[in-house]
Amino acid sequence: MGKLFAIVNQKGGVGKTTTAVNLSAALHELGLKTLLCDFDPQANATSGLGIEKRQIKRSVYDVILNGVPVRDAIVHTNFGDVLPSSSDLAGAAVELISADRREYVLKDALMEVKEEYDVIFIDCPPSLEMLTLNGLCAAEAIVVPVQCEYFALEGLSDLMATLRMVKRKMNPRLELFGVVLTMFDGRTNFSNQVAQEVRRHFPGKVFANVIPRNVRLAEAPSHGIPVMNYDKYSRGAKAYKELAEEFKAKL
């Protein structure tokens, strides 16, 4: 049976979707059967894996609100399976207010296919609202990308408080699996200081492999492919391959 991970940080621009796309694809390259659930209305993980809007007949929105079986919405790609998102998801938080088990609709859907995958990632939106709450209730563990920049730790206390609340009241199995340091520039004292500070706050939980600031990482999404397929020799590709190996060993 596979393991469900929510990739979450309520701050935008921290490399959350970049990590979701490239870590999922790198684990797929290592032979794991992966499913990436794009639960962000911006749908950047969907487009980042080459799935165009016109190709999407059913999305995660249809699964959680229209009763579409999750298998009917999954798209098979060369980089692993994807449960695509769409802009319709932006209104889902309001529509879920009157739903039964509203915090668990995503979990209920994903449980139908959980045994078919080694790893399922949920790319949560950059907020701590209903969609992210669904991601946290569905997951067994969370992965938190943290950028090595000013205010990196800002807001993480809110995220960890939410994690504790969900664990206490809704999902007792939920754990912090690991923290991924992103946008790291080893040439600067500042990046190194931030990395040290994050490791101090999360002892034993920060992955040894860090993700550098890298032009190829920024360019790959516009081509609809993971960085390993865009430029396999880039520092970004090497970093995500090494992170995937570390991640797999920790499973």
What are these regions (language model features)?
Residues 1-251:
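P-loop NTP-binding core
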